[in-house]
Amino acid sequence: MEERLRALCDLAVSGVRENAGLHEYDGRIQDLSPAGVRAGLARLDGSARRPGPPGPGRSAHDEAHLAAFEALARVELGELEEHRWNPLLHLDAMDLSCYDREYAPATERAEARAAHLAAWPDAVDAARESLDRVPRPVAAALLPAVRGLAAGLDPADPVAAVALGAHGRLVGHVERAAVSGDPDAALGGRALQRLLGVGQAMPVDLGRLEERADAERDRLRAMLDDACARLAPGHPTAEVVAGLLRDHPEAGAVVEEARMVTAEAIAFTAERGLVPGLDGECVVGPAPPSRRWALAMMSWAAPYEPDAPSRYYITPPEPDWPAAEQEDWLAVFSRSTLPAITVHEVAPGHFAHGRCLRRAEGDVRRTLHSVAFVEGWAHYAEEVCVEEGFRDGEPRFAAGVALEALTRVTRLAVSLGLHGGSMPPAEAVRRFEAEAFVYGPAAAAEAARAAYDPTYGRYTWGKLEIMRLRDRARAAWGGGYSQQRFHAELLALGAPPLGLMGGILSGSPGTG
């Protein structure tokens, strides 16, 4: 691998290992100590300053793509020093779940997992040294994840026993921050603007983005109202939504229903040609224990791995949960929302996108994936299915898409408000309840996520930028426009920074 790209990957080990399939990093934990981060940034700066031509065969577009990711690393770890206030970086580095998927023989993965686990004590020492300014809301929101990191480890195993001791020290460190940390987790408008814009290679006007979020919320609410009026004329939307969420498969049938919707979504995507060259196998099944924190997720066969089935994981409720908790969990898999979730996770969403990434040209496109593009594409895919008449345009599906989208647009509004200082935490919870039909503990958890995931509005932002580019493509290409052409040219870029997508119109980067 070329030196600049290697220096960048060394600063994003867990991400490139799992999402790009760079398994030379197996068994290793990124050094997130203060000295380790400084050394990594120094290598990054040294490789970027070294004179020489672009990497072999690298286009100007890919050069800009690489430069945006380099700039983002400097902002996250240099300017904002996220390793000092966000335990999530350290949790991601220590996470063992990356070895569960069958990308290599079981013995090889077991050896890598054991080496990774043996490195936990050093990783915890680095985390405790770095995490010296964790805000109280960040620590409180992440404590369950910190405690759950060691789930399933066997204390009778000598390596695991040492790792568990280290894990206890990390839990104690974060517990103390949850009591004594700064009560204010806001980054400030300038920091949020840098965090959003630099990695996407585009200027960001937070005020304008907030206006766009409000307009999108209003559009989505109208979409939901229309769907509910078609389903139950004369009944209030909230009443219809409550009924839709109560209509779900039983816990033991959720995975099978997801399997059927997956086949339907793949067939529809292929029939309409919504994603070029859709191939590969998508296996649907219950999430392994290490992934049960997610209700539904895609784990794709990554670009640098041998081809293998991608995994669409579904997490039904635990059978020993109280009945009310099981019902709340199953509402996510209602017959309105499960199809929306599935087209997002599978096709034309993440699974289909992952297949395109395996065919992307060049190391930059195969390795560096803009999360705002990845999630924006999958969220956009939901609305494309509504436009294209998935399930013959049934209003139940449109209602499910609108409900999912209202949660995501509320995340964008809340992240802008909380980190910009204009929205108190109680107002953030109220927004989810009033505007997204998310209530009680679920609304509180959604609002709390903004503290440690300040860019979690990326789903809506990415979707809006793709839709805006689509309008421009229609105008620029005229009679040569088709949905198939737009998707093919866009996905050929891999998962680019949002600000570079416009290169498909002009043939040059940075015009988005």
Q: Model-derived features: where do they sit?
A:
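N-terminal maturation segment of proteins
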Residues: M1-G512
